[in-house]
């Protein structure tokens, strides 16, 4: 069997979630390439990560500066979380990196992450972007907001996620399906703000507007640019990436829910925690602390046009151009607590 240098696909067997597959990235140069996970004390940290964009360069820099090798296995948040649970004390994972606070919160609730005492992390990561029990820490901020084609929509016509339920947007919306954690966490945040009855009313309004559902934020924006829709909900950094490659990309962003008294735009995180049974705990903590520094933050957030969690870190100039925003200060643990409620609500409202 020929194995590519880039990826080795691992079937999860009994530990898998339906149809999930993970890829073990064979990182170049200083990184292990497909070898078994190193034992404790071997100068390595093993990561299960759903964040895969641009991480190789970040981890290479960490290895050059510390001598600690990084190995990571990539896959979806829920699949990786289930794998850690199934592997129990035998898991090779030292760290779990997720792109959704809800899944980090669920991992902590399931006992998969250990509490960490770190002056550096407490100083570098604001309290609202980390678990109060220090089981996980936000590393970047991901803002989910409203995007539009300026030739067909004026920014003044847009205001909130809830207002997209207005019939004026019938046949004009492009959105992510209910199966994705981005949609689930947005709806969970709305349940926290409004309760289930009001949130279901909004979601039913979205459904009545017959949105085009596409399971890729990049593709959503490309469809918007090509005239296949007028308004979309995506994460901000997808537009940042497209503008990086094409500064004339014809889609604009507006920050949702910014009116006085409103809660602010939906902010999620990519974040990480150290697994309960980590064999290389000290190396994992060193990596977490390194990423939380202004230098680590610039590399980790800038590689994917995300906002740094550390306010002392510089913001990528493209997304700095999006202007200031006020984010929802919801306790991010609520995204995990309300995830199942959000999924049931989406199903009841026939949002697929």
Q: Can you say where each PLM-predicted feature lies in the sequence?
A:
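Ligand-binding pocket segment of bilobal, Venus flytrap-like solute-binding proteins
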Residues: 178, 182-185, 189-258
């Amino acid at each position: 069997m020929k194995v590519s240098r880039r990826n080795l696909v691992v079937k999860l067997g009994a530990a898998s979630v339906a149809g999930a597959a993970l890829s073990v990235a064979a990182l170049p140069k200083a990184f292990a390439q497909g070898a078994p996970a190193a034992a404790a004390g071997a100068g390595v940290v093993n990561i299960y990560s759903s964040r895969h964009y641009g991480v190789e360069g970040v981890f290479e820099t960490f290895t050059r500066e510390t001598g600690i090798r990084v190995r990571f296995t990539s896959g979806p948040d829920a699949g990786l979380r289930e794998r850690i649970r199934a592997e129990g004390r035998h898991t090779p994972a030292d760290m779990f990196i997720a792109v959704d606070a809800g899944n980090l919160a669920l991992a902590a609730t399931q006992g998969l992450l250990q509490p960490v005492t770190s002056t550096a992390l407490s100083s570098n990561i604001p309290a609202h972007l980390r678990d109060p029990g220090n089981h996980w820490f936000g590393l970047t901020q991901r803002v989910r907001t409203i995007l539009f084609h300026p030739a067909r929509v004026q920014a003044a016509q847009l205001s909130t996620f809830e207002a997209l339920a207005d019939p004026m947007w019938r046949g004009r919306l492009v959105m992510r399906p209910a199966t994705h954690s981005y949609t689930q966490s947005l709806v969970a945040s709305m349940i926290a703000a409004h309760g289930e009855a009001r949130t279901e009313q909004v979601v039913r309004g979205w459904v009545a507007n017959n949105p085009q559902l596409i399971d890729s934020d990049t593709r959503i924006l490309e469809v918007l640019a090509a005239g296949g829709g007028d308004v979309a909900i995506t994460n901000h950094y997808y537009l940042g990436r497209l503008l990086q490659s094409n500064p004339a990309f014809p889609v604009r962003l507006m920050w949702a829910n910014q009116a006085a008294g409103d809660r602010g735009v939906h902010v999620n995180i990519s974040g990480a925690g150290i697994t309960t049974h980590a064999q290389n705990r000290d190396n994992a903590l060193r990596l977490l602390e390194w990423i939380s520094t202004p230098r680590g933050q610039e590399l980790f957030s800038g590689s994917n046009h995300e906002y740094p969690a550390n306010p002392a870190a510089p913001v990528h100039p493209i997304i700095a151009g999006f202007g200031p925003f006020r984010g929802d200060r919801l306790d991010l643990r609520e995204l995990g607590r309300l995830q199942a409620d959000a999924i049931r609500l989406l199903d009841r409202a026939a949002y697929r």
